[in-house]
Amino acid sequence: MILGPSGAGKTTLGRRTAQRLGLAFLDIDEFIWRKDTPKPFTAMFSREERIARLQQAVSQAGRFVMAGSMDSIHQHFDPYFRLAVYLTAPAALRVERVHRRELEAFGPRVLPGGDMEEDHRLYLEDVAGYELGTGSTTQQRHQAWIDSLSCKVIYLDGAAPIESNAEAICQAWWKVMGLVKETGK
């Protein structure tokens, strides 16, 4: 499970890590956000639907790399996690990444005069508010989640190269799975 603030690089790192480990990749956004709306990421499935959709994917995948934020439903999935990764990055970098990602995905819709301009502006403010506790997802909430986990947790910097972070996750995974012996002890 890779968790952290928007724009930290969870999805990119999750995809790369899953590829390296030969595991399924589950992007939480795919299971929680409705796609039948005029404006993307404005309506979620009901809590029950989110749990059922993700539970089905987890059951089908067996072993997997999951990435995203699942604050309101994580308790249903925590027992599946053997390793959790808390990925962070500086707020300015995260805001820049999110802006670039949304601009690439939605083009002029997020620019001044576009039908998503206001939503985009509010989302960027939300991303910037993660550490301050003013965002919809907060550092405090994620830390409480991490503190409740019984699996191994590693902390990574989303500003670091993807390959080095993927390697760190792979090494931690192999240790958790008993495939690598610790040296020097």
Give the location of each predicted region.
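Glycine-rich phosphate-binding loop used to anchor ATP phosphates in small-molecule kinases
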Residues: S46-A92
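Hydrophobic anchor at the beta1->P-loop junction of P-loop NTPases
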Residues: I2
